[in-house]
Amino acid sequence: MKKSNDCLKSKLLLYAHYYSPDVASTGQILQDLAEGMKDVFDITVICTVPSYSGIVADKYKQKKYYYENINDVNVVRIRVPEFTKSNKLSRIKNIISYFFGAINVTKKLGKFDYVYTISQPPILGGLLGVTGKRITKGKLIYNIQDFNPEQVM
């Protein structure tokens, strides 16, 4: 009996605050990355519901989590509060909601061989990756983008 290729694939968990169809550059880059690796890895992306503009569509306001498959990539979307780009408190609430929602989803998904995260949002991206690594027992891949130490001040 011949084994399916999917049985041989390593599992990769990818954290992305934004993912397709959001137009944020990080979401587009991570979509290209995920779709480019889907033949080698069984990929699951944990991201927010489409909300780059700050507005959440009505179809994403009913449930806490949404499960989709986009071009053979498993996507788990987390409902987050709407925000205004000029209101820092609303942005912080959005980021914190994603962070804790992503941790809860990660606990439900089980083990992964690799956990991939980026430095967006700053600090929490790395913290989410380390937490995800501990939960899934996977190896952490941390992609640092746009590193600007002066942002801390």
Model regions: which residues?
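Structural motif
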Residues: 11, 113-114
